[in-house]
């Protein structure tokens, strides 16, 4: 739980006691497709970029590929693999697949993948996320944006490469904020 993981047990306890609030009770308010749409809208408002789903080879039918476009020009791409399944490593993370760099053939655009282990959809019902999972998604997407929006062409320091361990968390924690912002929650 968000509060408990940050040493805010008293806040969590108060939520439960005063409001009978639980993560499970919030799930109907956070269907995964709407969360993604809201996340992409927030990113558009913050950075002026569009996120467009594209056809691409994927390793599992749950995985999807998207590109970031700035005024119609592709600046990077990413894969989302959001749902838990048999044999998949647990946890949530972002990894760079390809970094931005200049090559003899021109600019190589960055690509990353973001992996989570949310409860998958059942039948034709959308997957429902807890608010903690929404925060996790925003956090990992912050890492992804850090990787994809770099304008540095030196692969050794592009994106998250060469960034101190504490500073590498800044963009991801910045994105977490938007999972709490009232105006942003209206988009979710």
Can you name each region flagged by the protein language model?
Residues 1-12:
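Single conserved hydrophobic/aromatic residue that forms the stacking wall/gate
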Residues 19-29, 51-54, 113-135, 150-161:
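Glycine- and acidic
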Residues 6, 74, 150-188:
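Acidic/histidine-rich catalytic neighborhood
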Residues 10-90, 94, 164, 168:
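Gly/Pro-rich turn-and-neighbor structural signature
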Residues 2, 42, 46, 144-148:
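Short alpha-helical functional segments enriched in proximate histidine and acidic residues
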Residues 59-60, 67-135:
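Active-site-adjacent "gating/activation" loops or surface patches in catalytic cores
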Residues 132-147, 172:
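Active-site recognition of the HExxH zinc-binding catalytic motif
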Residues 2, 34, 132-136:
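A generic "alpha-helical surface" signal
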